[in-house]
Amino acid sequence: MARRGDTMSIVIIGGNDRMICQYKKICKKYNCKAKVFTQMIPKLGNQIGSPDIVILFTNTVSHQMAYCAVAEAERNNAEIIRCHTSSGNALNGILEKVCGL
């Protein structure tokens, strides 16, 4: 896990396609670097990398994506945060707790 003041690496799995730019903007506000995957892509596990945190928006993610993301997070000892809603406010709340800004 990154120390306070360092840039945290976050992967967001699920959510809405039209919100990708907003998710990244919100993460930037909390000094976090974000990768966002709203749809299943080939070799998703390789694309995830080794983030500090994986956020799963469970309402908008396929089971296949969720299983792949959780497996990669566990393999890299990343924290997994599950959230049912995929709104910007939900992401703000998660990052507020994690980053403490």
Predicted feature residues:
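Short glycine-/small-residue-rich Rossmann-like dinucleotide-binding loops
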Residues: 59-60
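An anion/phosphate-binding loop that grips the pyrophosphate of nucleotide cofactors and donors
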Residues: 51
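Short, charged N-terminal beta->alpha structural module
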Residues: 8-31
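Ser/Thr/Gly-rich flexible loops in soluble cytosolic domains mediating phosphotransfer, phosphorylation
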Residues: 74-101
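A short, well-structured beta->alpha microelement
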Residues: 32-47
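Short, Lys/Arg-enriched N-terminal segments with co-localized hydrophobic residues
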Residues: 1-7
